[in-house]
Amino acid sequence: MSRFKLVLGIVIFSLFFMIVADYPNTITLELGVFSGSNWGVPSGESYKIIDGAIERFEKKYPGVKVKYESGIMKNDYSSWLSDKIVKGEEPDVFMILDDDFNTLSSIGALANIDSYMTHDQNFSTDDYYSSVLKAGTYSNSQYALPYECNPTLMFVNKTLLENCHIQMPDNDWTLDDFYSICKKVSEYSSNYYGYYDYGWLDSIYAYGAQVFNEEGTKCYLDQSAVKRAIEFYRKLNNLNEGHTVTSEEFEKGLVAFSPLSLAVYRTYKPYPWRVKKYSTFEWDCLKMPTASKNQGSAQVSTLLMGMSAKSHHKSQAWNLLKELCHDQTTQQSITQYSQGISPLKKVAQSQTIIDMLDEETGDSKISISLLNQALLGARNREKFKKYDGAKTMIDTNMMKMIHSSDDFDLSLIELQKQVNKYLNE
């Protein structure tokens, strides 16, 4: 009997030891990522950033492993993620495309991370540019953290301005400066155009105006600031005399200005990619023009990451989310191996990043001071469920209104009624 107890004890102890020994490897987190750049530019280093972050994370937390499915392209990522969600197999932590955030938040796919941010002593929202952090909010709660951001700048065709005997504007230029130069360019030659791809929403941002309320229940097209912004866009559009400027004309060097993201600038300004695009003329970038030196902003695009609301390991998932979006080493590698910039103020303003950008841009007007200024006052797209539909409705009607002989103010009021009806259906 005693021998039986001894053998049984050994077996139980062995099983217990095996369970304990294996415990550190029992938690596996799945990460959802896509290959390449989020910004539509060439990039082959996206996994280098992720793999480095995972390696550091697993060293910090030896009881947790991280896996991800490679080879998913950005164009396929939304479908891949939605299929996972439908099957109840969504990753614990995953990237969120800008167009998907409102939907994922509204259907409850993302975990509310307010309490994690509040109670984590190693985390502070003050570390982020507030404008970029806001990209992850929905209904006044935080559902995602910014992983990488991409502010909008203004492309300037320096060669064309020189041909027209126009001086390069400064970074503190205004909408009046922008319009004046576009007008001079259009008058100098019938083959030249002042701008390409500058939209009514760019003008809204430049005036610091608000098209919708935060809840997404009201549209403000008839408010004075919005009307001034749209009227400026209408006046600017009239310079083209009905001609729709094309991307081909822009790439041939026939256009003075066009909004351009930092990612495109960082990709095509330095060698070797410089010879692939915009190589037939000299160009640079400036801050987007605003209504005045103290008023207005520009759009910033943000790649977000969030936690699944159904994750069985939310504490570990939060730590992984922090490793990707809040760890300074990871964030520094994003600026090094990707084309956007870190949403963390300390990283974006670090000497390492300053030196990196100086090496890339040379004698350009782009500087960390300019980027810091752009990010401090940047604006994200609105975060409510019907935003995309409401914006499409305005887009569709805006060009018709601009070219119509109908009363412009009455047309705006009528469009506002239509949008408000849609928002409250």
Regions found by a protein language model. Give the residues of each.
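Paired acidic/hydrophobic, glycine-rich loop segments that form the ligand-binding mouth/hinge
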Residues: 92-95, 256-261, 266-267
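Extracytoplasmic/periplasmic substrate-recognition and gating elements
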Residues: 65, 238, 275-343, 376-379, ...
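Extracytoplasmic/periplasmic solute-binding protein
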Residues: 139-147, 152, 176-219, 225-226, ...
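Hinge/lid segment of periplasmic solute-binding proteins
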Residues: 98-151, 280-289
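Conserved N-terminal structural module of periplasmic/extracytoplasmic solute-binding proteins
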Residues: 1-103, 107, 292-295, 316, ...
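Short helix-initiation/N-cap motifs at beta->coil->alpha
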Residues: 70-80, 173-179, 241-252
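Long, aromatic- and glycine/proline-rich binding clefts that accommodate carbohydrate-like moieties
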Residues: 286, 336-400
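Glycine-centered hinge/linker elements that transmit conformational signals in sensory
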Residues: 182, 216-244, 288
